[in-house]
Amino acid sequence: VLKDPDGKYVMADDARFDPVFGALAKQGRTLVAHLGEPRNCWLPVDQMTVDGDRRYFAANPQYHGLLHPEIPNYEAQIAARDRMLERHPTLRVVGCHLGSLEYDVDELARRLDKYPNLAVDLSARIVHLQIQPRDKVQAFLVKYQDRILYGTDLQFGGRPDAADADPAKLLA
């Protein structure tokens, strides 16, 4: 989470980013952006929808947004992202982790319909699709297939040597 020199949280719609987003759009570049944690990050552990999130946030309370009211909440972060997309309609954006709308493909579809230059990847959130109605998810994937990218968010178990290691050996 980024703070400015005054200690204020910097959101995706901060005007200081406008020249960067404008330049990217003008050059036809794509912004790949992680713009928010999963909605589960802002729920009590016992209300989270997937086991992986329950385990992760229970073991890592420093990242559990609900426990940190000083951090802008989920709704504020998503709203800031949406305002940024509205201000930069020609900027191509890939929203990592299903655009942080992993909990509901209908909600994500509304954003994809509203923002034609928005695409999303599946990294680290595909499990959230598995708990939604199969037919609804299948229809969503078919309809938006040209705007959904496969992603892994692959980690190597927090191994400090992973960054310098031969990927083939790490995957063996």
Q: What are the roles of these predicted feature ranges?
A:
Residues 1-64, 116-119, 124-126, 134:
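Active-site gating/metal-coordination segments in enzymes
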Residues 11, 68-71:
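Charge-dense, low-complexity intrinsically disordered segments
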